[in-house]
Amino acid sequence: EGESEVSNQWLGNINSIRGYNEVMTSPDIYSLFNNYKYLLICQTDVWIFRDDLMKWIDMGIDLVGAPGPNRNMYLHFPMKQYLQLKVKLKPANKNLHCQMFGRIGNGGFCLRKVELFKNLCIKYEQEIQLYNSLEDPLHNEDIFWALVPTELKLPTIEQAANFAFDRKLELCYKINNYTLPMAAHGYDRKHRKQFWSRFIPKEAFKKQ
C-alpha cells in the first residue's frame, strides 16, 4: 500500500532502459514487496481489457507474461534444425531473436513471484552482471528471465496468450481461440495499431 520512491539511477531519464534492466534484476526491488507473494508489473503502454489477476495468482506459477509464440514453420524440418544450428554457432555473448520463439514472459505486463525472483537475482548475480553490461534489446531484463533461469514454473504458450499479447498479434489471437487476453502491451506502437484499433477506442492511441 502507498508509494515507494526508488533511485533516479534506476528509473527516469538518467540511465533509461539500462537503469530499468538493473532495477528489475536487483534483489532490492523485490525486497520492497516482501509482504506480498506476487508483483504485477504494468508499464504505461499497457491496455487492460479485464481483471483476471486472481486466476493467475491461484495457478501458483512463478512468472507469466506475453508469450513469444512459435510459427508452425519453425517447428518442423528444415527450419527447426536451421534455427537450432544458428543458436549453437552464435557467439557466447550474443542472443538471437529466434531464441525467444516459444518462450514466456515479456516484461511490459507480467506477474512475478516476489520471494523467488529476489533469490534468483542473488543466485544468478554473475549472469545478470553480464546481461546488464551488454546494451542491446536482446539482453533486456525480460529476455534474461526468459532464457537463463531453468527452474521457473511457467504456464504453457496457450495459457500465456490468455494473459497478454505483445508480438505476433494475429498468431496470439489465433492461439487464444480468437479471444482477447487480459491485457495488451505496446498496443499504441505504430505497427500494432491496425490490429488493436479493432478492440481499443481510437482515443487511446497517441497521435503519430
Task: Please annotate each region the language model reported.
Residues 25-28, 55, 63, 116, ...:
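Alpha-helical elements of Rossmann-like donor-binding domains used by nucleotide-donor carbohydrate transfer enzymes
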Residues 36-49:
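Short beta-strand-to-loop acidic/aromatic patch adjacent to the donor-nucleotide binding site
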Residues 24-28, 50-52, 96-97:
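A generic local structural motif
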Residues 91-208:
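Catalytic core and acceptor-binding pocket of nucleotide-sugar-dependent glycosyltransferases
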